[in-house]
Design a protein with these regions (language model features):
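Short S/T/G/P-rich N-terminal loop/turn motif that feeds into the first structured element of a domain
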Residues: 1-70, 79-96
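A common structural junction motif
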Residues: 72-74
């Protein structure tokens, strides 16, 4: 069953370009390290928060990525720019 990891955070507006570049590098590094990432979608809300949604083919793939993240330099680089970070995990139960 597909799962979503949903990260909500803030970023200094001056760091937006850097965030986008580092996130792109992180997505590529995760895809190289762990199979199963279906899509990664980043949105900016009207209130200035960002939401990064990563869709995985299974909970096992998502958990493998979380376990691998500390060994992936791009993860530390991307997360060094964010503040007020929260994470939620969700199971996809219906799609139309």
């Amino acid at each position: 069953m597909a799962t979503l990891r949903i990260d909500r955070f803030t970023v200094d507006p001056a760091d937006t370009e850097q965030l986008l570049a580092r996130r792109n590098a992180l997505v590529a590094a995760i895809r190289d390290a762990v199979p199963g990432l279906i899509e990664a979608r980043l949105v900016r809300l009207d209130d200035g928060h960002w939401i990064d949604m990563w869709r995985w083919d299974s909970a096992a793939s998502q958990q493998a990525a979380v376990a691998a993240a500390p060994t992936i330099p791009e993860a530390a680089a991307a997360f060094s720019l964010v503040g007020n970070h929260t994470t939620e995990l969700a199971e996809v139960v219906d799609e139309r």
